[in-house]
């Protein structure tokens, strides 16, 4: 479908939510001083679904993730978790309700062993774990890693000795072992090589096939979206500009949509700043496997 056919008015109309949504947000807005990060975000997530969130740097992706996990509070809008109104007071509150997040910094303690890292933060949720011996923690850690297919040579080594992909896998395993129903992944493939990226994509694919955990993850590479996601949403200028099952779209269409949205935003900025405004580079000349550049994320 051509970009000019896909648009209705300013933005593509996202499909309506349904009663079986595990998470639903409506009209979420967030500003930082004079900077608007999110204008009017509407999003839904079904049980077992993997949603890929795309957008330029500065489009509002990370801000949305931080609101969903309770790290930041929205200025307006509503959220529902399993059909009930939901307004997390903190990251710990969101975790206690089954929403866990893997941020880019991962929050692993380099000096601690793999198995110790797997049990970090578990004591903060509504069901704290009792005191466990190292023997029990080793056994439970190995069981958790085996269940989701993560191959770590030794769970006794400090986290500092793990590769980037292994660290990311441990962080994801920790959220799953903590009984999370919804996992938010903030750029899980950032700065990874092909082998490490494949490890994380394989892990996400296995979780997707099991269908027990719903996932929202920020991605920049369109190929990764189609390899691991059931649905893709494009956030642009603080709103969801495109939302569609990956089976019903393609890399080419997604690229065309992104370029068209970028040109619309550039044209609007030029009108707002006057005819003398300096245009930004056209993303149409870039590799379609990566999103267009932009300012730093708010």
Predicted regions and their residues:
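Glycine-rich phosphate-binding loops of nucleotide-dependent enzymes
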Residues: 3-274, 297-298
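Long, low-complexity, intrinsically disordered segments
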Residues: 286-298
């Amino acid at each position: 479908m051509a970009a000019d056919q896909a648009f209705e008015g300013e933005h593509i109309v996202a499909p309506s939510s349904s009663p079986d949504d595990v998470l639903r947000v409506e009209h979420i807005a967030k500003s930082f001083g004079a900077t608007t990060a999110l204008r009017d975000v509407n999003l839904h997530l079904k049980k077992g679904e993997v949603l890929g969130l795309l957008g330029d740097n500065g489009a509002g992706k990370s801000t949305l993730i931080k609101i969903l996990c309770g790290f930041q509070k929205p200025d307006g809008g509503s959220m529902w978790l399993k059909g009930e109104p939901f307004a997390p007071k903190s990251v710990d509150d969101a975790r206690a309700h089954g929403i866990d997040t893997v941020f880019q910094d991962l929050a692993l303690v380099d000096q601690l062993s793999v198995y110790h890292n797997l049990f970090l933060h578990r004591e903060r949720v509504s069901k704290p774990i009792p005191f466990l011996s190292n023997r029990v923690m080793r056994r439970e850690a190995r069981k958790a890693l085996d269940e989701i297919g993560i191959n770590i040579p030794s769970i006794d080594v400090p986290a500092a000795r793990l590769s980037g992909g292994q660290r990311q896998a441990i962080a994801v395993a920790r959220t799953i072992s903590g009984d999370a129903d919804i996992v938010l992944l903030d750029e899980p493939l950032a700065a990874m090589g092909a082998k490490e990226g494949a490890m994380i994509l394989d892990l996400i694919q296995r979780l997707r096939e099991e269908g027990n955990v719903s996932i929202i993850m920020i991605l920049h590479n369109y190929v990764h979206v189609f390899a691991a996601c059931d649905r893709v949403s494009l956030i642009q200028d603080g709103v969801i500009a495109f939302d569609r099952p990956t089976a019903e779209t393609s890399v080419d269409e997604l690229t065309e949509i992104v370029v068209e949205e970028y040109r619309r935003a550039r044209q609007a900025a030029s009108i707002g700043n006057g005819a003398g405004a300096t245009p930004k580079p056209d993303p149409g000349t870039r590799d379609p496997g990566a999103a267009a550049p932009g300012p730093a994320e708010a």
